[in-house]
């Protein structure tokens, strides 16, 4: 059995298939965690979703901002932009099955290794105040609403940059919006955990007072290894507490997968080149 994590696929099904073939992935033997943004900007989002659905529990996805955007567009609460490539899902004969599968995916996952090490997985980031247990619990609050009859109302209320910081006293849509923004959109924040959504540059280009979320001193998840995607200008990072796997497949970069051994320190990076589906900007 092999354990893998893969970065943002974003509808690039051909690259996804080539990477699965490269590692000889077996649904009966291996486990693949998909770090969000399965869809959008690439040409074949529908095929990506079908491949993941067909694999059952061997492919375990979590939701990114583009996946939530697809759900919002499908509910009619958000219009597709000129850069979106969601029509193949929205017009698919199995649209309802694809969307139902997607809405049942969580915003965070945790994998406990045989020796007790924890691999925590999110699409974008976590706030410095949150422990691993809190990340999973807060993600679960959103997961419950996504599967409920409140889905259209939640998707309507999900958009916005405020509140820009966490408080355990937050309630209702504001509470869920902060959770969603941290887990699916976060790149930079202050040392106090105030989120910034204007900067999308690499970590070295942070504005004064801002830092990558994973470099905040005293981060409560520091004892876990966190795998994430979302940040293509960051590129691949591998350090004891961190695995960054968005390497810009949709922009003509590569699709990246990490294979873990018996310990989280045992890692092998596997990549395939991607044709450019869209230009950045």
From Swiss-Prot:
The keyword Heme does not apply. InterPro entries: ApaH, Calcineurin-like_PHP_ApaH, Metallo-depent_PP-like. GO terms for molecular function: bis(5'-nucleosyl)-tetraphosphatase (symmetrical) activity. SUPFAM superfamilies: Metallo-dependent phosphatases. The keyword Hydrolase applies. It catalyses: P(1),P(4)-bis(5'-adenosyl) tetraphosphate + H2O = 2 ADP + 2 H(+). Pfam families: Metallophos. Keywords: Hydrolase. Its EC number is 3.6.1.41. Belongs to the Ap4A hydrolase family. Hydrolyzes diadenosine 5',5'''-P1,P4-tetraphosphate to yield ADP. This is Bis(5'-nucleosyl)-tetraphosphatase, symmetrical. It comes from Delftia acidovorans (strain DSM 14801 / SPH-1). The lineage of its organism: Bacteria, Pseudomonadati, Pseudomonadota, Betaproteobacteria, Burkholderiales. The gene is apaH.
């Amino acid at each position: 059995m092999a354990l893998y994590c893969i970065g943002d696929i974003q509808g690039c099904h051909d690259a996804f298939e080539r990477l699965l073939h490269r590692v000889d992935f077996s649904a009966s033997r291996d486990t693949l965690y998909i770090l969000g943004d399965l869809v959008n900007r690439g040409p074949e989002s529908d095929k990506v979703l079908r491949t993941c659905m067909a694999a059952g529990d061997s492919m375990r996805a979590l939701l990114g901002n583009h996946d939530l955007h697809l759900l919002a567009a499908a509910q009619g609460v958000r219009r597709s932009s000129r850069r979106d490539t969601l029509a193949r899902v929205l017009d698919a004969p199995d649209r309802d099955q694809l969307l139902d599968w997607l809405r049942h995916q969580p915003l965070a996952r945790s994998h406990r290794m045989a020796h007790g090490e924890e691999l925590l997985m999110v699409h974008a980031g976590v706030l410095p105040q949150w422990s691993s247990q809190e990340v999973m619990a807060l993600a679960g609050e959103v997961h419950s609403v996504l599967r409920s009859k409140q889905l259209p109302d939640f998707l309507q209320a999900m958009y916005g940059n405020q509140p820009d910081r966490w408080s355990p006293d937050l309630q209702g849509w504001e509470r869920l919006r902060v959770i969603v923004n941290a887990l699916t959109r976060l790149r930079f924040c202050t040392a106090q955990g105030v989120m910034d959504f204007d900067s999308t540059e690499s970590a070295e280009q942070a504005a004064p007072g801002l830092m990558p979320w994973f470099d905040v001193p005293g981060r409560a998840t520091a004892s876990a290894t966190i795998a994430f995607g979302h940040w293509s200008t960051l590129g691949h990072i591998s350090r004891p507490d961190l695995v960054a796997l968005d390497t810009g497949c949709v922009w003509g970069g590569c699709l990246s997968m990490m294979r873990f051994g018996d310990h989280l320190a045992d890692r092998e990076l596997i990549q395939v080149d991607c044709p450019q589906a869209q230009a950045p900007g």
